Amino acid sequence: KQPLHALPLLGASLGLAAAGILMSLAASKTRPYSYIPILIGAICAIPSVLSTLMPQQMGHIWILTSAVTALTASALPWMCLSFARISVDSPHSESEIFALPNDIDYQDIKRRYIAGSTMLFIGRICVAALLLIAAPLLNTLDTPLGSALCLAAFLGMLLDSRQIYTFREMCVTVGAAGIGIIVTGSLSVQTHQEFSIPLILLMLACAFATILFTYVLRKHTLFATRVADAAETICIMLILPLAYLAITL
């Protein structure tokens, strides 16, 4: 019997990529969105092939895949902004301040913005899908560090949603993070029953903090912003150490 994250997932990944290619050929007007199944299928095929060839190392392979994916999620806005070539020229001298502005091609800026925004949306969907695919396997490993890695990745994704201002990206990011946290909590409690009480208390504390800063404290204070930034930074910094410990221990 083949594990789900090996040969079966490889077949599903190839089918998803093939469906994306057919979608791009059939619907040229929505061609950028056909890259979503192509990218998800192509990226999932890599750890699936490695897991099929090295089934004993399947857990390690998906731990590395999840860690790289979670770190890539934090760099997506910068990567898409660089790809769209949108920059702001700030004057550095008095002559530049009083100089006549250069002509601005608004249509070109609009096209670049649409391209960058679409790429960012596609990237967020791919990251969310990869983390959700890997979450069941990581939460059923012998070590609870796999669950800790998933929790850090999804919490970082949830905290990163504070910087999102488009409705569709907000739905994808918050929805995937919420589903991932629920899956992590339910599977890790079943697999590692000795950690059920601390995990439940941690999730209750996170829910209380979210409700407090979202609904109770209507005014966004500088303290709350700094606490959220610090929490997001800690989640990102914990990903690589947790992945290393989950592999070596």
Residue ranges and their predicted role:
Residues L4, P8-A19, I36-T173, G185-H192:
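Generic multipass alpha-helical transmembrane bundles of integral membrane proteins
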Residues A19-R31, L155-T166, I211-T221:
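C-terminal ends of transmembrane helices
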Residues R31-A42, E169-G178, R226-E232:
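Cytoplasmic-side transmembrane-helix entry/capping segments in multi-pass membrane proteins
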Residues C171, G178-R218:
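C-terminal hydrophobic structural anchor segments
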Residues A243-L249:
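Juxtamembrane boundary at the C-terminal end of a transmembrane helix
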